[in-house]
From Swiss-Prot:
GO biological process, one term: co-translational protein modification
Function: Removes the formyl group from the N-terminal Met of newly synthesized proteins. Requires at least a dipeptide for an efficient rate of reaction. N-terminal L-methionine is a prerequisite for activity but the enzyme has broad specificity at other positions.
Keyword annotations: Hydrolase, Iron, Metal-binding, Protein biosynthesis
Disulfide bonds: none
Cofactor: Fe(2+)
Binding residues annotated for Fe cation, in chain numbering: C135, H177, H181
Active-site residues annotated for this sequence: E178
HAMAP family in the cross-refs: Pep_deformylase
Protein's UniProt name: Peptide deformylase 3
Matching Pfam families: Pep_deformylase
């Protein structure tokens, strides 16, 4: 049985308080922000479009806190709802520390730090790719998700500049995963649930570059 943390996490989500005040209180805790886990309603609500609610200075501090939290977790992406803030803001960064064979099969290449404000994506073409993925809000588990192999992402950056880019391979998976968070979706909503595996099982059995062996053993289909 897991013991409850004795760290007090401030309630930053009271609807009666201005968002800026709630974020200020959250940032006052210092260090990496607490990551909320599946079962928290904030992860199931569509996030509010960002329209200057935090102001430039507070936005910059919040973005830096997201970056710090993502690195500490560690992860390759983090959406604002995952720290209890229902705004359409996410950060991504992937140094791609994987063997060359794995990187080639999964299309995993290094991605610089990026801030995505009000992002949305659409599939480009019909190709789909299926790989195991995990989530900082669902710790300890991974599952296979089939996603569009190429997507067009539109968003703003932290300075309000337009972003309109196509992503392929693992970067496409990251931007889809984080944008889904902003729409109240978890990766498990799109996953092949027969593939659900603990991190221990992943390390022991399913560390291959593709999930083909897992599909055969666990009884689930992969896209053609």
């Amino acid at each position: 049985m897991a013991s409850e943390s004795d760290r007090t996490v401030p309630d930053t989500r009271s609807a009666s308080r201005p968002l800026a005040d709630r974020v200020e209180e959250l940032l006052a805790t210092g260090g990496p922000l607490p990551i909320v886990a599946a079962g928290d309603p904030v992860l199931r609500r569509g996030a509010e479009p960002y329209d200057g609610q935090l102001g430039p200075g507070l936005l910059a501090r919040f973005v830096e806190a997201l970056r710090l939290t993502m690195h500490a977790a560690p992860g390759v992406g983090l959406a604002a709802p995952q720290v209890g803030v229902g705004l359409r803001i996410a950060v991504i960064e992937d140094p791609a520390p994987v063997p060359e064979e794995v990187g080639a099969v999964r299309g995993r290449v290094p991605q610089p730090f990026r801030v995505l404000v009000n992002p949305s994506y659409e599939a480009v073409g019909s190709d789909r790719a299926a790989f195991f993925e995990g989530c900082l809000s669902v710790p300890g588990w991974q599952a296979v998700v089939a996603r569009p192999a190429r997507v067009r992402l539109t968003a703003l950056d932290e300075h309000g500049r337009a972003v309109d880019e196509e992503f392929t391979g693992w970067p496409a998976r990251i931007v889809q995963h984080e944008t889904d968070h902003l729409d109240g979706m978890l990766y498990l909503d799109r996953a092949e649930l027969r593939s659900l595996s603990s991190n221990e099982a992943m390390a022991l059995r399913w560390s291959q570059p593709t999930p083909e062996r897992a599909a055969a053993a666990l009884g689930f289909a992969l896209p053609d």
